[in-house]
From Swiss-Prot:
The gene is cdu2. Belongs to the peptidase C48 family. It is an enzyme of class 3 (hydrolase). Keywords: Hydrolase, Membrane, Protease, Secreted, Thiol protease, Transmembrane, Transmembrane helix, Ubl conjugation pathway, Virulence. Effector proteins function to alter host cell physiology and promote bacterial survival in host tissues. This protease possesses deubiquitinating and deneddylating activities. This is Deubiquitinase and deneddylase Dub2. Pfam families: Peptidase_C48 (PF02902).
């Protein structure tokens, strides 16, 4: 009997697959395509992360240039030379607007300084102006207690009450950014603009309520930045009707109630663009308009402002230079007194 030889048990051996790295030049066509796609994908992701690191305001303020033909580029440079002659004009913000209104109050006495602690926008200016004029009316007839009187933080209630009693011209400034479509969004945009230190798309416009002349005047240095003149007139006519009820006509017949409560007149003060492109001078133009109004409420803006851009710029530059030093006395933002 022959011995049985059992075969040795088979064992499974697992070997680690070897990875061979090949250069792009020696790689197969499919590998090359795969590597190119991966590289492009990583580049796109990297660019997206870089763009996310920028704020929206940084993108708006970035400089972009387009290649124009020689003739178009020459015409553009000629237009810019007409406008941007001389050093850049300073930017007047809410503090400058307040200081200038204090200067006008000191000169004309009938002007109430601008309250910059309550930001006005196109969403709340109608209600705010009505409340301010109603407060003046109640103060005049001693219906408002000193404790109930709201006054700016840099003015005492007693002084604010006296200023209200002696004022008949009420200037209000509105801040606007076209990208904001609600009051909350507008205030958020305002905070972002102040924090960034950039003007961006922000803009100041002016509303003047004159009780003696029973008139509401609107001024926009860009003419139609917030809305068209007709749209602004429609909004202001509602305000004018409310003011007519708050301040009835003096000397009218008691029997003619409609005549007594006739609305204030509405005037659109800007029929042309007076602010040049590339300049941030809306605040200074609001102050210049207010100064002209206080000299003559019936003045014609087109007669005051030159049509030539360089002459118009020189006019505003002269106004700023002759006014800034006098305004500096109110740099502490304290309200003027009636003493």
């Amino acid at each position: 009997m022959e011995p049985i030889h059992n075969p040795p048990p088979q064992t499974c051996s697992y070997s680690r697959p070897s990875t061979t790295y090949t250069s792009f030049k020696d790689a197969s066509c499919g590998t090359k395509v795969t590597r190119i796609i991966i590289a492009l994908f990583l580049i796109v992701i990297s660019c997206g992360l870089i763009l996310c690191a920028y704020t929206f305001r940084d993108l708006l303020d970035a400089d972009y240039s387009a290649q124009e033909g020689p003739q178009q580029a020459t015409k553009l440079l000629q237009q810019l030379d007409k406008v941007l002659t001389g050093p850049p004009l300073p930017i007047w913000d809410n503090e400058h607007l307040f200081q200038f209104s204090c200067l006008m109050q000191n000169k004309h006495r009938r002007v109430l300084p601008i309250d910059i602690c309550n930001p006005l926008t196109k969403f709340n200016f109608l209600e705010y102006i009505c409340n301010c004029l109603m407060t003046k009316q109640s103060v005049n007839v001693n219906e408002t207690d000193m404790c109930e009187l709201f006054c700016p933080p840099t003015c005492t209630p007693e002084n604010y009450r006296r200023l209200l009693c002696t004022s008949s011209v009420f200037p209000f400034v509105m801040w606007h950014d076209p990208s904001a479509d609600t009051q909350e969004a507008m205030l958020t945009k305002m905070d972002q603009t102040m924090s960034s230190g950039r003007v961006g798309n922000s803009h100041w416009v002016l509303v003047i309520v004159d009780i003696e002349h029973r008139c509401v005047t609107f001024f926009d240095s860009f003419y139609n930045y917030i809305a068209s003149p007709q749209q602004m007139r429609e909004q202001l006519e509602g305000l004018a009707a409310s003011l007519g009820a708050i301040y009835p006509k003096e000397g009218g017949s008691d029997s003619d109630q409609e005549e007594l409560l006739s609305p204030f007149q509405v005037r659109i003060g800007s029929t042309v663009k007076v602010q040049s492109p590339g300049e941030f001078t809306c605040g200074a133009w609001c102050c210049q308009f207010l100064a002209w109004y206080l000299e003559n409420p019936d003045f014609d803006l087109e007669e005051k402002v030159p049509t030539n851009p360089s002459e118009r710029r020189a006019l505003l530059a002269d106004f700023i230079s002759t006014t800034e030093q006098a305004m500096s006395r109110y740099s502490s933002l304290s309200w003027p007194t009636t003493d």
